[in-house]
Amino acid sequence: MYLEKLSLTDFRSYAQVDLTLEPGVTVLVGYNGIGKTNLMEAIGYLATLSSHRVSSDAPLLRFGTERALIRAKLVRGGQSTVLELEINGSRANRGRINRSNPVRARDILGICQTVLFAPEDLALVKGDPSNRRRFLDELLVSLMPRHSATRTDYDRVLKQRNALLKSGRSGKFTAGHEATLDVWDQHMARAGAELLYARLELVERIRPHLKAAYAQLTDGSKEADAIYRSTLQGILDDDGAGAGYAAEPAAVERVEDLRALSVEELTQRYVQAFAASRRKELERGISLVGPHRDDVELILGEAPAKGYASHGETWSMCLSLRLASYYVMLDDARTGGSAPILILDDVFAELDVQRRRKLAAIVSGAEQVLVTAAVDADIPDELAGRRVKVVPGGIDESESR
């Protein structure tokens, strides 16, 4: 798959901009703050319905406007698809496929597939568990769009259950509330089990690719790995942080391997866990058990990457996670899926020469690679390709080559 045309209206700094692209490598060059990342952000948003920079849609709308429009023409196997996504400030976002009648935004998921590398990726290692959960869920939805509904259902039930728990904290909890909480426990157990089962499967798909990617980017002296940590295993504390599992491998060996359980069995585990934690949850007014508090522990050698990896090792781990997601998507592409568009947003400026060259050599063979840089000198020779000059408010075609 490759992106042939991109058009933005009232998105971020752009009142209107049109960009024509082609397969292979395209490097967008322009000084910092000119709007290169805004272009890449729009493509990523079209693929995931979320920004890698902000948590809400409001900053995506050009100041003083009520809506933004992203329009893209994608080509796959000689067939073209036109996607439109309207981002609204006051109502639900809407999409269009080949100029159809409007559809829900989530109905366009899975059509445009991207893997986006950005400086913000450092949070995958250094940040809190929510960054790693988001990484998993975005990849999950890209591979299987139906899981967007799975996550939406879980978030809806979690919100309702938390509201009920808060009423208990305020002293308004009655026998009727207890019965209602039992019902919400069942709903949340089922929704949580479906999400957990999908995440566990995905992590197992990621792991071999993560190890291979890290070996490609480094000298191979350390091995990278990823292990899913669930609140069902009792090794996360009440704030979702690891309760010493990295320092106590013997304790980890004793925890239940959830990968062997079915959705039905995971549902029952959640029902039991909710019952066991009810008193504490009522005291705190929040749900303490569930996928919303899980983590993915990233391992480098024998130690957790977070807190132990050097700056260079942290970057290698982040890049390896993104490459692993790319390889997982390629696995699907071989059985009817689409090869994703690779986006490298201001990444090379953050890397030493060795990592630049190794990363460039790995990604250069992708069907389409979009790179942003402040100066040409940041781009390794392995990524020779078309250059596009980004200027205030748009593209300078006369300077592009």
UniProtKB/Swiss-Prot annotation:
Keywords on record: ATP-binding, Cytoplasm, DNA damage, DNA repair, DNA replication, DNA-binding, Nucleotide-binding, SOS response
GO cellular component assignments: cytoplasm
SUPFAM superfamilies: P-loop containing nucleoside triphosphate hydrolases (SSF52540)
Places the protein is found: Cytoplasm
PROSITE patterns reported for this sequence: RECF_1 (PS00617), RECF_2 (PS00618)
GO molecular function: ATP binding; ATP hydrolysis activity; single-stranded DNA binding
Pfam families: SMC_N
GO terms for biological process, alphabetical: DNA replication; DNA synthesis involved in DNA repair; double-strand break repair; SOS response
Family statement drawn from the similarity comment of this UniProt entry: Belongs to the RecF family.
Function: The RecF protein is involved in DNA metabolism; it is required for DNA replication and normal SOS inducibility. RecF binds preferentially to single-stranded, linear DNA. It also seems to bind ATP.
Protein's recorded name: DNA replication and repair protein RecF
Organism this protein belongs to: Arthrobacter sp. (strain FB24)
GN (gene name): recF
